[in-house]
Amino acid sequence: MIFKVFYQENADEVPVREKTKTLYIEAESERDVRRKLQDRSINIEYIQPLEGAHLEYEKQSPNFQVLEISS
């Protein structure tokens, strides 16, 4: 399944909505997403599963690129 992760680049700063970034990652579950990203110093705000029409909509974005991290 593909997940959309909303995050802040600096885990030490207070989250500011205007600085929120996104990435797409393939994983089995939300827990698997967190495990795959644990070595990065980012502040994960929200993890959203993408499927069906929502996934197709996201694929139309020029920023849609699935991050590949091995388990």
Swiss-Prot record:
One of its GO terms (molecular function) is DNA-directed RNA polymerase activity. Pfam families: RpoY (PF07288). Its EC number is 2.7.7.6. GO terms for cellular component: DNA-directed RNA polymerase complex. InterPro entries: RpoY. It catalyses: RNA(n) + a ribonucleoside 5'-triphosphate = RNA(n+1) + diphosphate. Keywords: DNA-directed RNA polymerase, Nucleotidyltransferase, Transcription, Transferase. GO terms for biological process: DNA-templated transcription. The keyword Ion transport does not apply. It is an enzyme of class 2 (transferase). RNAP is composed of a core of 2 alpha, a beta and a beta' subunit. The core is associated with a delta subunit, and at least one of epsilon or omega. When a sigma factor is associated with the core the holoenzyme is formed, which can initiate transcription. A non-essential component of RNA polymerase (RNAP). Belongs to the RNA polymerase subunit epsilon family. This is DNA-directed RNA polymerase subunit epsilon. The lineage of its organism: Bacteria, Bacillati, Bacillota, Bacilli, Bacillales. The gene is rpoY.
